[in-house]
Amino acid sequence: MFVKKGDKVRVIAGKDKGTEAVVLKALPKVNKVVVEGVGMIKKHQKPNAENPQGAIVEKEAPIHVSNVQVLDKNGVAGRVGYKVVDGKKVRYSKKSGEVLD
């Protein structure tokens, strides 16, 4: 998967299209990512010892990795490629040619 935790991404599809934010979690087995402030859902929490009333909590839901593009250091969104530099495999932006790792 071309997206890693901590990457700055732009959402390119869905209700949050155009939003730029940081990846909080990458889920490679299901090809999804959790992006900060994107795909917010309301989760109903049952009452428990620390919260006897229960609550409705807003949290980020995973979105499909094809709906985001990685931003390079200049803020340019583009596809990601891989190349070997000094015997080490690194990710780079195909649009700007800049190394991402």
UniProtKB/Swiss-Prot annotation:
Keyword hit for Ribosomal protein: yes
SUPFAM superfamilies: Translation proteins SH3-like domain (SSF50104)
CDD domains: KOW_RPL26 (cd06089)
Gene3D superfamilies: 2.30.30.30
Pfam families in UniProt: KOW, ribosomal_L24
Record PROSITE patterns: RIBOSOMAL_L24
Subunit annotation: Part of the 50S ribosomal subunit.
Function: One of two assembly initiator proteins, it binds directly to the 5'-end of the 23S rRNA, where it nucleates assembly of the 50S subunit.
Stated name of the protein: Large ribosomal subunit protein uL24
Organism of derivation: Streptococcus uberis (strain ATCC BAA-854 / 0140J)
Gene expressing this chain: rplX
